[in-house]
Amino acid sequence: MFYKIAQKVMFQMDPERAHHLAIGSLKMTANSPLTCLYGQTIAPAPVSVMGLTFPNPVGLAAGMDKDGESIDAFHAMGFGHVEVGTVTPRPQPGNDLPRLFRLKPAKGIINRMGFNNKGVDNLVKNLIAKKTDIMVGVNIGKNKDTPVEQGKDDYLICMDKVYLHAAYIAVNISSPNTPGLRSLQYGDLLDELLSAIKTKQLELAEKHKKYVPIALKIAPDLTIEEIENIAQALIKNKFDGAIATNTTLTRDGVSGLANANESGGLSGKPLTELSTKVIKQLAMCLKGQIPIIGVGGINSAEDALAKFDAGATMVQIYSGFIYQGPKLIKEIVNAYRLK
C-alpha cells in the first residue's frame, strides 16, 4: 500500500529526480523504525551459486544503488543479494541530462546514464559502513575517458579495491552507454580482458586467502555465434558466473510510445522475451559448467520462472521492481519455493 502511494507521487516527477529521492529516503530510513514502511520478512529459500549460498534467489540488479548508499534498506525488503555499481576507478558525472525515461504503457525504461558514480573509493567506504550481512555483488566498469584498449586496467583497479568487500564481482562490458564498451565482448579484446581479470582474481585470492567469484555481464543484442564465443571464453578463463542480460538497443514492442526514440538501453517488460532467449542460448553453450544469473524484464513471478526454466540459477530485478514494488520479491521467492 505504501509503495503504491509513493510510486504515484514519484511517477509525477522527473525519473532521475525520483530515483535520487528514493535512494536518499532509503538511506535515511535504513536501520530505523521507518523500515516498517517497506520492509518485509521472507522465509529463506537458499540457493547455491558460484560457491556462495544466498538466502533466496532474487537480487537487486546493478544500476539502482550505484554507490552502495542504501544497501541495508534493500536488505530489509527481503532481497537475497544486492548488486551495487556500476562503479569506475574515478568519479564521473555520466552523460548529459535528461538521460532516464519511463515508457509507462509498456512498463519499460530507457536510460543513457553513462556510468555516473562517485568512484570506487567512495563505494568501498559505503560497503564498510553497511550494518547488515546481506550478500553484495560489486559491478565494475571503465571510465568513459579510458581508451578501450586500456580498459582492462580500469577493471583491475576496481577489482583490487573492492575485492575484500564483495561477495562477488560482476564485470560489465555490456552497457550501451559508454562508447566502445561493448566491443570488449568480441574476439581478442574479450579474451585478453577475461584472462587479465582471472589472473588478478587468483593473485588477490592468494594474497587475501579469500576467493571472490567473478561473473561477466553480457548484452542481449548478440548473435548465436557471438554467444557461443563468449561462452567458450568464459569456460576457457574459468569464470565463476555469467549475468544475462543488460539493456537492449532494440525497440521491439515500444514503437510509437512517448520517449521510445530516445537513445540508450531499453529495460523492463519489452526486454523480457529477448533476455530469456539469450539465457537459454547461453545455457546451451555453457552446458552447466558455469551458472547464469538471469536479469531483464522480470515483471512477475511467471517471468522469473521462465528465466529459471531457460537455465538461470538465480535472478535479479530492477525495472520490474520500480513498477511492481517490493511485493515482487516475495512473489518470486514463493513461486521458486513451489517450483
UniProtKB/Swiss-Prot annotation:
Coiled-coil boundaries: none
UniProt EC number: 1.3.5.2
Cofactor note: Binds 1 FMN per subunit.
GO cellular component: cytoplasm; plasma membrane
Main location: membrane
Pathway: Pyrimidine metabolism; UMP biosynthesis via de novo pathway; orotate from (S)-dihydroorotate (quinone route): step 1/1
Keyword Iron carried by entry: no
Keyword tRNA processing (UniProt): no
Positions annotated to bind substrate: 66, 111-115, 172, 177, 246-247
Catalytic activity: (S)-dihydroorotate + a quinone = orotate + a quinol
GO biological process assignments: 'de novo' pyrimidine nucleobase biosynthetic process; 'de novo' UMP biosynthetic process
Cited CDD domains: DHOD_2_like
Subunit structure: Monomer.
Family that this chain belongs to: Belongs to the dihydroorotate dehydrogenase family. Type 2 subfamily.
HAMAP family referenced in this protein's UniProt entry, alphabetically: DHO_dh_type2
NCBIfam families: PRK05286.1-1, PRK05286.1-2, PRK05286.1-4, PRK05286.2-5, pyrD_sub2
Protein name: Dihydroorotate dehydrogenase (quinone)
Organism: Shewanella baltica (strain OS195)
Organismal lineage: Bacteria, Pseudomonadati, Pseudomonadota, Gammaproteobacteria, Alteromonadales
